């Protein structure tokens, strides 16, 4: 599957726009290429590589043209390009992902605790949305996206995407952190290690404890 070349600029715009409100601390030097070396200078959660040893490969990644494998339980695949893939992103306050969706596949409800997200759809049809906080009465903000459409997910809000079309879908998203993190709600609540007390979850979700135990057995094995 090939992404239309005419839509690639939208992905680039999405990433550029994510620069505006980066949540990571601003750097005080040209760059701080991340390195696993305890002798380095510790900046923003990473040690800095000696600037004299930095080269172009520290700012490079190849592979976002390759579709991810969506043959899994949720029917989607996220290819992440953050500070772990590009060490030069350290202190830059940005990262990028490619998301592939099989027909009816989804990126299930999740949050990014350290960054907001701006997503551009380049192929297929997605139903996307986020839910606001308790103080805002948990309102759902959702739209059906078509190629070229853009949607923003505020930092920390539970959000999702699902492919409602008959063909595979592809999206790119920029995040306002070098490592925005991800908390998948179902996996976190029902697949924690060690498990949360079933009785607590049963009351919280108004479910029978046996249902909770079944969910914990399912998600605990993922």
From Swiss-Prot:
<dbReference type="InterPro" id="IPR019780">
    <property type="entry name" value="Germin_Mn-BS"/>
</dbReference>
<feature type="binding site">
    <location>
        <position position="117"/>
    </location>
    <ligand>
        <name>Mn(2+)</name>
    </ligand>
</feature>
<keyword id="KW-0325">Glycoprotein</keyword>
<dbReference type="Pfam" id="PF00190">
    <property type="entry name" value="Cupin_1"/>
</dbReference>
<keyword id="KW-0052">Apoplast</keyword>
<keyword id="KW-0464">Manganese</keyword>
<feature type="domain" description="Cupin type-1">
    <location>
        <begin position="62"/>
        <end position="213"/>
    </location>
</feature>
<keyword id="KW-1015">Disulfide bond</keyword>
<comment type="function">
    <text>May play a role in plant defense. Probably has no oxalate oxidase activity even if the active site is conserved.</text>
</comment>
<feature type="signal peptide">
    <location>
        <begin position="1"/>
        <end position="22"/>
    </location>
</feature>
<dbReference type="GO" id="GO:0048046">
    <property type="term" value="C:apoplast"/>
</dbReference>
<feature type="binding site">
    <location>
        <position position="159"/>
    </location>
    <ligand>
        <name>Mn(2+)</name>
    </ligand>
</feature>
<comment type="similarity">
    <text>Belongs to the germin family.</text>
</comment>
<dbReference type="GO" id="GO:0031012">
    <property type="term" value="C:extracellular matrix"/>
</dbReference>
<dbReference type="GO" id="GO:0030145">
    <property type="term" value="F:manganese ion binding"/>
</dbReference>
<dbReference type="InterPro" id="IPR014710">
    <property type="entry name" value="RmlC-like_jellyroll"/>
</dbReference>
<keyword id="KW-0732">Signal</keyword>
<dbReference type="InterPro" id="IPR001929">
    <property type="entry name" value="Germin"/>
</dbReference>
<protein>
    <recommendedName>
        <fullName>Germin-like protein subfamily 1 member 20</fullName>
    </recommendedName>
</protein>
<feature type="binding site">
    <location>
        <position position="110"/>
    </location>
    <ligand>
        <name>Mn(2+)</name>
    </ligand>
</feature>
<comment type="subunit">
    <text>Oligomer (believed to be a pentamer but probably hexamer).</text>
</comment>
<feature type="glycosylation site" description="N-linked (GlcNAc...) asparagine">
    <location>
        <position position="77"/>
    </location>
</feature>
<feature type="binding site">
    <location>
        <position position="112"/>
    </location>
    <ligand>
        <name>Mn(2+)</name>
    </ligand>
</feature>
<dbReference type="InterPro" id="IPR011051">
    <property type="entry name" value="RmlC_Cupin_sf"/>
</dbReference>
<keyword id="KW-0964">Secreted</keyword>
<dbReference type="InterPro" id="IPR006045">
    <property type="entry name" value="Cupin_1"/>
</dbReference>
<feature type="disulfide bond">
    <location>
        <begin position="32"/>
        <end position="48"/>
    </location>
</feature>
<keyword id="KW-0479">Metal-binding</keyword>
